[in-house]
Amino acid sequence: MSQAAKRLGSLLIPFVTLCGCAVVNSAPPPQEVVQLRNARDACLARNVAALDDYRSDAATIGMAVVAACRYENQALVSAIAGPDGFRQGEISRQIEQNSLDAATQSVVAHRASRRS
């Protein structure tokens, strides 16, 4: 074996070994995410009607609604983050904010529909 081949081999062995350590973030099946979002959205809708006291501001009720749907949000976060938890904190913050926005808008729409 020539010196060049030995040198190339000594460089490739650590590289190939490190490739086994690469993080693989596999995306969940799209239908699973849709199903989990639908479950979360249904939870938000149920709890808007159940928790709205018609006195508190919409954002306060929205926060209570999101808290009531924490299990649905966590299931969605876990599915998107995958088994390795890749970017779980960031995904959790985004889903929490999305849920809060949706819940607050649902409170506003719910109140408007009661008035008409």
Where are these regions (language model features)?
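Bacterial N-terminal signal peptides that target proteins for export
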Residues: 1-12
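Structural motif marking the loop-to-transmembrane transition
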Residues: 4-5, 58, 88
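C-terminal motif of bacterial Sec signal peptides marking the signal peptidase cleavage site
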Residues: 18-20
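Bacterial signal peptide processing site
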Residues: 22-25
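Short N-proximal segments of mature Sec-exported proteins
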Residues: 32-77
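Compact alpha-helical subdomains of small soluble proteins
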Residues: 62-116
